[in-house]
Amino acid sequence: MCTFSMTIKTFLLCLCLTACNGNEEVYSTTLPEQETEAETSSGYPSLLNKTVPVPAEYLEEAASQGSVVQIDYDTRNYVDGNGEMRSNTAYVYLPYGYEESSDECYDVFYFVHGHGETAASFFQNENGMMRNLLDHLIANGDMSPIIVVSTSYVYGTPVDYYPDADPYCKALPQELVNDLIPLVESRYRTYTQQTDFEGLQASRNHRAIGGFSMGAVTTWYALECTLDYFKYFMPISSDGWSLGRFAGMDYPDETAAHLADIIRSSSSSGNDFYIWACSGTDDVAYDRIWIQVQAMAQITDVFDINHLTFHEQESARHVFGSLSEYFFNALPFMFPDCYDVNSQQFTNDNL
């Protein structure tokens, strides 16, 4: 938590948000209602966009490496709602140079794993693939330095049948807001000045949540239940289950209308949110999320392409290894590196 004013930096980062995003190839599947949109503040010209492959060197160890810290914390049983105390574990990525930059605040991305994995998986799988990617994105100036927190919805022994994890996925956003986010964002230098609910709402523009598979189910629940605490949502390869298991695929119009009503009634977020949804063309869950996203895009007063886009990775399957390309494309959009704090000059040539 930073205790000094970052007003100028925050304003300039917001001002340059759209100018730093041009790193995706796109092809048009613009809906009829959106054909009049020549340009949008999102930087994406259509609902459906193709992702750009990750350079091979980004998956290798970087010269400047961040660190990963384990955090064990106290929480409650939010599934049964009985107030029973329990413990959970998260892993926090701190970017290279964090210890030396005592006057800089950091945005935070919260990641939720898929079935059969743990909070440790995000930074360990594929020989540290995601950790290497973060190191390179930051070192090469593709994005601003951020803190990444890998979380878990698992209570004790994981369930065998992945849909049975649904109640745990639904409970995790509440656990994050009540217990983990206040701990992380008071311990580390973030934009959160106070860790009560009002303070977390005030800093929501500097916070994102995303997840893969059942983690995507969790991300849709976060949109439904904790919209006032996150600005960016990154569901990867699964639909939302607010109206029942697989409801986003089976009842896309009803799911879209439900989420739109939630957003319209939000007390603090207004239209200040963004859903960066994605999947792979060979992913078994591709249709689940894409069907829902198309239904959402029909509700143009809420889910126009300034607030919702879908990003498709060619030939990608439902495996952890596909995540690097999604994050390579998404993180520079959410957290652009447009402003050099030391020189107090914009660094993007397009500005």
Label each residue range with its predicted role:
Residues 1-3, 351:
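Accessible peptide chain termini
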